[in-house]
């Protein structure tokens, strides 16, 4: 059975970098996916699902939830790795509930933990505005992204805490310290 770890955190928390480094350090056993990459890859395949994804994204619309969850589960199941890290998901209560429903309806993938990389809003802001990835990384957009992250956060935290799946990792430290702690935690499930 595949072991799934969801990695969540504010914009600038380092969740993607952390997940990428852990997958790279453990390339035999761990795969890392981001939801956006999965949707783009599926779209590029021109499958029935891919064409549907393209129809929405080309119009600048959100891809329907069921399609996103199907795409995620399909990628997990087809991966040759036993441990899967997905960063930036869930971003909403609806995404959380949809994934939970799908995971409960099958027996190939088990959610082992939701790891939250926790940083202060000031740290997140410094990191995002300091790295200037593009025009969207300005202050107004940062605050909007932060709001989108924070609005459902307590409900998401409480849902996974009730299932004893929520783990907080202090993201205010060096990348090495964060990656080491997260990697040790993830690998503790493999034994």
Swiss-Prot record:
Its EC number is 2.7.4.3. It is an enzyme of class 2 (transferase). Pathway: Purine metabolism; AMP biosynthesis via salvage pathway; AMP from ADP: step 1/1. Residues 34-63 are annotated as: NMP. InterPro entries: Adenylat/UMP-CMP_kin, Adenylat_kinase_CS, P-loop_NTPase. Keywords: ATP-binding, Cytoplasm, Kinase, Nucleotide biosynthesis, Nucleotide-binding, Transferase. GO terms for cellular component: cytoplasm. GO terms for biological process: AMP salvage. Signal peptide: none annotated. GO terms for molecular function: adenylate kinase activity; ATP binding. ATP binds at residues 12-17, 131, 173. It is found in: Cytoplasm. Catalyzes the reversible transfer of the terminal phosphate group between ATP and AMP. Plays an important role in cellular energy homeostasis and in adenine nucleotide metabolism. Consists of three domains, a large central CORE domain and two small peripheral domains, NMPbind and LID, which undergo movements during catalysis. The LID domain closes over the site of phosphoryl transfer upon ATP binding. Assembling and dissambling the active center during each catalytic cycle provides an effective means to prevent ATP hydrolysis. Belongs to the adenylate kinase family. Monomer. HAMAP family: Adenylate_kinase_Adk. This is Adenylate kinase.
């Amino acid at each position: 059975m595949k072991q799934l770890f969801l990695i969540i955190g504010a914009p600038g928390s380092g969740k993607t970098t952390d997940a990428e480094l852990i997958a790279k350090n453990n390339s035999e056993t761990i795969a890392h996916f981001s939801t956006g990459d999965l949707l783009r890859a599926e779209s590029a395949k021109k499958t029935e699902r891919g064409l549907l994804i393209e129809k929405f994204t080309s119009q600048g619309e959100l891809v329907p939830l069921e399609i996103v969850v199907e795409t995620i589960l399909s990628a997990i199941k087809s991966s040759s790795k036993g441990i899967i890290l997905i960063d930036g998901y869930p971003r909403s209560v609806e995404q959380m509930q949809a994934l939970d429903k799908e995971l409960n309806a099958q027996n190939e993938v088990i959610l082992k933990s939701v790891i939250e990389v926790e940083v202060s809003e000031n740290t997140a802001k410094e990191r995002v505005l300091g790295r200037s990835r593009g025009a969207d990384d300005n202050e107004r957009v940062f605050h909007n992204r932060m709001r989108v992250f924070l609005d459902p956060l307590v409900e998401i935290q409480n849902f996974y805490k009730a299932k004893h799946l929520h783990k907080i990792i202090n993201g205010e430290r060096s990348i090495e310290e964060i990656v080491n702690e997260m990697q040790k935690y993830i690998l503790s499930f493999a034994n």
